[in-house]
Every structure is written in structure tokens, then in C-alpha cells.
């Protein structure tokens, strides 16, 4: 490849050989997504945003060890979004690790105009209500009519914007001051919406790739 990427997986080789030319086809192929470079090939121009940076301390036999934990969301603002956290001794390393894992967690969000107040055929909102959980936090997302905007907390809004959702009602329950769980619950809600239309065999393979 011109960018120096040498595919290591069957899915990667299919992308490199031109057999798979879109992210949608890759996600529906039933093959595990294990190479961040593959996502770069199919979704050039992905944006990333660091939602949270925390210092994590742990006692070891050699003394106190400090690492940084970063929470990152990525997306193309048109139906694709990923989420992950990364840890490293350096902030930059933690961010890059999170970005790479977020690419492996990329999902295809079913955009639409599911609000009864909206005209059918749009892609400004979600198709239907969806919920997601992470820790004590639960996030509910509901379709909203065009022009409403995102009635959401800042963390939830960042995830939805990068996913391409322009209008939505949201509700959050639990300890919503925890950015990590709030972002993950929002991502899980979008993933649940995505999986509601995904064949079972593809869903299982994708889950294996994220573990």
C-alpha cells in the first residue's frame, strides 16, 4: 500500500485488494476488525476528540506508578462513530492508544428521521428510541424533529455530533459527572441502535473484535 500499511488479516487483505471498498461492507462482512489502518483506508478524514484525561496511580513492588487514562471518541459526522479509553505513561501515548482502539470499535449508526413531528426520509436524527448503560449511568436517546438540535449534556453532545446526529432528545440517569461512563453509555446506546438491524452472525463477530 502507498501509505506503508501491510494488511495482517483476511479483512485487511480484502480491503487492500479492492474487494471491500466501504466501511459498511467491512462491518457486514462477518470478519473481525482488528487493524486501525483498515479504518483509515475506508474512512479517511475521521475526526477525534479527547473527552477526558485522568492520572491513575497504582502501587507496585517498586513503588507508586503513575499512568494517564484518556477517553476518546472518533467519528466522520455522517453515521460512523467509535469510542475507547487508553492508558500509557505519557498523555500522547494514551491518546493514540485510545484512538487506535476506538477505530476497532467503529459502528454504523442508523441515521434517520424517526420523530413523528418530522418528515420521513431525512438523516438528521435517529430511527427509533435507544438506550445504553455503563456503570451506574444510563443514557436514553430519542428521535427529534429537524431544527431542534441536541438537547444533551456536553459529553453526550460530543459523541452524537461525531456520529452525525443533529437532532435528538436525551435523558441521563446515574452518576453523570463521570465522563468515562457517560460517554460509554452514549456510545452503547448508539451501538444498540446499530445492532438492532445487524445480522446475528455479524453481531457476534463484532463483539469478539471489541473484547
UniProtKB/Swiss-Prot annotation:
One of its GO terms (biological process) is translation. Residues 197-211 have a biased composition (Basic and acidic residues). GO terms for molecular function: rRNA binding; structural constituent of ribosome. Coiled coil: none annotated. The keyword rRNA-binding applies. InterPro entries: Ribosomal_Su5_D2-typ_SF, Ribosomal_uS5, Ribosomal_uS5_arc, Ribosomal_uS5_C, Ribosomal_uS5_euk/arc, Ribosomal_uS5_N, Ribosomal_uS5_N_CS, Ribsml_uS5_D2-typ_fold_subgr. Keywords: Ribonucleoprotein, Ribosomal protein, RNA-binding, rRNA-binding. Residues 191-211 are annotated as: Disordered. GO terms for cellular component: cytosolic small ribosomal subunit. The keyword Chaperone does not apply. Residues 46-109 form the S5 DRBM domain. Belongs to the universal ribosomal protein uS5 family. Part of the 30S ribosomal subunit. Contacts protein S4. With S4 and S12 plays an important role in translational accuracy. The N-terminal domain interacts with the head of the 30S subunit; the C-terminal domain interacts with the body and contacts protein S4. The interaction surface between S4 and S5 is involved in control of translational fidelity. This is Small ribosomal subunit protein uS5. It comes from Natronomonas pharaonis (strain ATCC 35678 / DSM 2160 / CIP 103997 / JCM 8858 / NBRC 14720 / NCIMB 2260 / Gabara) (Halobacterium pharaonis).
Amino acid at each position: 500500500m502507498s501509505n506503508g500499511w501491510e494488511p495482517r488479516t483476511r479483512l485487511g487483505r480484502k480491503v487492500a485488494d479492492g474487494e471491500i471498498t466501504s466501511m459498511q461492507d467491512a462491518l457486514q462482512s462477518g470478519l473481525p476488525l482488528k487493524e486501525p489502518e483498515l479504518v483509515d483506508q475506508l474512512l479517511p478524514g475521521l475526526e477525534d476528540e479527547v473527552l477526558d484525561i485522568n492520572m491513575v496511580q497504582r502501587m507496585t513492588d517498586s513503588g507508586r506508578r503513575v499512568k494517564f487514562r484518556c477517553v476518546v471518541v472518533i467519528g466522520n459526522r455522517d453515521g460512523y462513530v467509535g469510542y475507547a479509553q487508553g492508558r500509557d505513561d505519557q498523555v500522547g501515548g494514551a491518546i493514540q492508544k485510545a484512538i487506535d482502539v476506538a477505530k476497532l470499535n467503529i459502528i454504523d449508526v442508523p441515521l434517520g428521521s424517526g420523530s413523528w413531528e418530522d418528515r420521513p426520509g431525512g438523516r438528521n436524527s435517529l430511527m427509533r428510541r435507544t438506550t445504553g448503560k455503563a456503570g451506574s449511568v444510563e443514557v436514553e436517546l430519542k428521535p427529534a424533529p429537524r431544527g431542534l438540535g441536541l438537547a444533551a449534556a456536553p459529553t453526550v453532545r460530543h459523541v452524537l455530533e461525531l456520529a452525525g446526529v443533529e437532532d435528538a432528545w436525551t435523558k441521563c440517569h446515574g452518576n453523570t459527572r463521570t465522563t468515562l461512563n457517560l460517554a460509554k453509555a452514549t456510545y452503547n446506546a448508539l451501538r444498540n441502535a446499530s445492532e438492532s438491524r445487524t445480522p446475528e452472525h455479524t453481531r457476534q463477530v463484532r463483539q469478539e473484535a471489541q473484547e
